[in-house]
Amino acid sequence: MKSSQDDLYAKPYQQVSDFQFDNKVAGVFNDMIRRSVPGYGQIINTIGDLAQKYATPNSKIYDLGCSLGAATLSVRRRVEGRNCQIIAVDNSESMIERCKENLSAYVSETPVKLVCGDIRDIEIENASLVILNFTMQFLAPEHRQSLLKKIYDGLQPGGLLVLSEKLYFEQDKIQSTLDDLHLDFKRANGYSELEISQKRSSLEHVMKPDTLEQHKIRIKQQGFSQFSVWFQCFNFASMVAIK
């Protein structure tokens, strides 16, 4: 399905409501994330590469917070012939409906089970790969460790978690510098000062980024044997953890 241009915050609002993944956002999401998240295309492509390396025959692959299915599509193209099943989960009905249309545009022998629900309620089992692509940051902080435990318990030995997140930096000058670079990235992609300001206000109470150290500690506490950042641009990073 073709994505419209993101102009959701182009006109001034008297009061900016909290960001939610509703039908309006789903309709412009491809354009929004491409113009807002530096390196997003590279992350999606590399998730497919990682799936090719880590997906084991007859295993399950989970895309938790699948949105329109970009990561699922990238994975599905790279795991054909392995009898894998992909479980793609999102709590937005609008996202799931558009994801279904996007997936149906391509023929594949790898089945995808679409689930509209809370990722905290999903049973994870026999997983060779679990993807959290800019999802954890929207989950209440007190639920993040328990979700990681569920993922760890459901992964096969040697299984891979891909975790992409916006990061917060405790060093104030580093935080402000990387934040400024990100805002310049959005300006270069055509967003106005009004759009940037209103979008930021809408996300203020919804998205709660962690520091890289918080991610490291949480993953180590859960028992993952290896962890690394494989991609970072400004204050956006993608990490891998191996069980």
Curated annotation (Swiss-Prot):
A GO BP annotation: tRNA wobble uridine modification
GO molecular function: carboxyl- or carbamoyltransferase activity; S-adenosyl-L-methionine binding
Binding residues annotated for S-adenosyl-L-methionine, in chain numbering: 40, 65-67, 90-91, 118-119, 133, 200
Keywords, comma-separated and alphabetical: S-adenosyl-L-methionine, Transferase
CDD domains: AdoMet_MTases
InterPro entries with a match to the protein in the record: CmoA (IPR005271), Methyltransf_25 (IPR041698), SAM-dependent_MTases_sf (IPR029063)
NCBIfam families assigned to the protein according to its UniProt record, in alphabetical order: carboxy-S-adenosyl-L-methionine synthase CmoA, PRK15451.1
Subunit structure: Homodimer.
Name the record gives this protein: Carboxy-S-adenosyl-L-methionine synthase
Taxon lineage: Bacteria, Pseudomonadati, Pseudomonadota, Gammaproteobacteria, Alteromonadales
